[in-house]
Regions:
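Secreted, disulfide-rich extracellular signaling modules
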Residues: 2-6, 17-425
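Acidic, glycine-enriched active-site microenvironments
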Residues: 10-11
Length: 425
């Protein structure tokens, strides 16, 4: 009896081994019967991987920057700032008395909060303040406002040694200029300009960052009197239809000069004003429909830019383009994007002078695109490259575009597993 059981057990072992050998020869049934078998991963390089790319300029919208950049970098870059104080306090209440009209001011100042992270400061820094209010000029025109930065309109300023420059600075203003605005109920609009004995760039806090500038003045010559504090506010453009524009124009950056040479066959990210690159992909149907993507690496070749140095680093995020196929204005489409890190967790940290291949992992996004193919109107397979922060640092990165040569243009390396079709062995 024992001998018969041993023979029967041996037959089962042989049958099982035969089944596995048969599975290897029968193809698709093997993974189900023999899960311990290794899975073959295939690689492919898609070149070109983009059907289209383009660079769009002017991000974010004026006044929505997280800081105002004051920069003076020789004949290449110069930026200035504008802060609007369209409502000034015209009355004060002395101790134990009733309200009085202000007829004299003293110790007028504008307080600026500086963000010195990644700032470039020469040995001496000078801040000049100009009256840039003109009721006859188009106050939404950058050129019209820049024309008001003239010597006869300078109403304040001061200089600091680099070692004495703190995170908060008080720049003196002309008392007579401030009083004239108060008495005549006029707007106080300040234009800021920074200069030094070398290349300079520093960020100034804004309403958006929660560290807005502030004007202060005493309502009389009594040094013991408490200064009156006035926050920024914009009253134009007037009307109930423009509240967001008024808010944006409360404080903003003006680009007086950006003379960085443009290159053919490239796309740009960052810079002043901010640039974004829109990349639309063309992926083979068999990759999207018939495989499981385990890795997808977008390779971009960076073109070195002469402007900038090792201090001008820039972080670049790849955002998923969310605008549907009916949005044909691609500049608008670059505003309809995902939050950073959604489906594309990777980012780049580069300097303008860098060169070589930069890689962005995108396998999660490719899997999402595969799931969207069942939609009636799936969104385009596209991403937007965007600097972070945007339009507050003078760093710009450039990459070769799809119109460049085959060895320089964007490519994608994909590792995938062919999907098995299970059936009867």
């Amino acid at each position: 009896m024992i001998r018969r059981l041993a023979i029967l057990l041996a037959m089962f072992v042989v049958a099982g081994a035969g089944a596995c050998r048969e599975s290897l020869d029968s193809g698709a049934a093997c993974p189900a019967l023999c899960p311990a078998q290794s899975v073959a991963i295939r690689d492919t390089l898609i070149n070109p991987v983009l059907v289209f790319d383009s660079t769009y300029v002017g991000y974010p919208e004026r006044g929505r920057e997280q800081a105002m950049l004051l920069a003076a970098r020789g004949d290449t870059l110069e930026t200035r700032g504008v802060i609007r104080f369209d409502t000034l306090t015209a009355f004060y209440v002395p101790t134990g008395d009733t309200a009085r009209t202000i007829t004299r001011v003293d110790s007028s100042r504008v307080r600026l909060v500086l963000d010195r992270a990644k700032a470039r400061l020469p040995a001496q820094v000078t801040f000049d303040v100009y009256d840039v209010d003109d009721s006859t000029a188009a106050d939404t025109s950058a050129a019209a406002v820049l024309a008001l930065f003239t010597a006869d309109r300078r109403i304040g300023g001061t200089s600091f040694l680099r070692d004495s420059l703190k995170d908060t600075v008080a720049v003196p203003l002309s008392d007579s200029a401030v009083l004239e605005k108060i008495v005549n109920k006029r707007r106080l609009r300040l234009g800021l300009r920074a200069s030094g004995n070398g290349p300079l760039s520093v960020r100034v806090g804004t309403v958006e960052s929660g560290s807005a500038a502030e004007v202060s003045y005493r309502p009389n010559a009594d040094t013991s009197a408490k200064p009156l504090l006035v926050g920024p506010i914009s009253s134009t453009p007037a009307g109930a239809d423009f509240p967001e524009i008024r808010s944006d124009l409360t404080d903003y950056t003006l680009v007086a000069k950006y003379a960085v040479q443009q290159d053919a066959n490239t796309m740009s990210v960052g810079g002043i004003p901010g640039r974004r690159a829109y990349l639309r992909f063309v992926l083979p149907a068999y990759i999207v429909d018939s495989t499981t993507v385990v890795r997808a690496t977008l390779r971009l070749t960076q073109r070195p830019l002469a402007f900038g140095d090792a201090l001008d680093t820039i972080t670049i995020h790849a955002h998923v383009a969310l605008a549907g196929p009916h949005v044909t204005d691609l500049r608008r489409a670059t505003n309809v994007i995902s939050a950073p890190g959604l489906l594309v967790n990777d980012s780049l940290l580069v300097t303008p002078a860098d060169s070589g291949v930069r890689s962005i992992e995108m396998f999660g996004l490719l899997r999402a695109w595969a799931g969207q193919r069942v939609l009636v109107n799936p969104p385009p397979q596209a991403i937007v490259l965007r600097a972070s922060p945007e339009s507050v640092l003078p760093a710009e990165a450039r990459f070769y575009s799809t119109t460049a040569g085959a060895t320089l243009r964007p490519v994608m390396r994909i590792s995938y597993i062919p999907r098995a079709t299970f059936g009867v062995p």
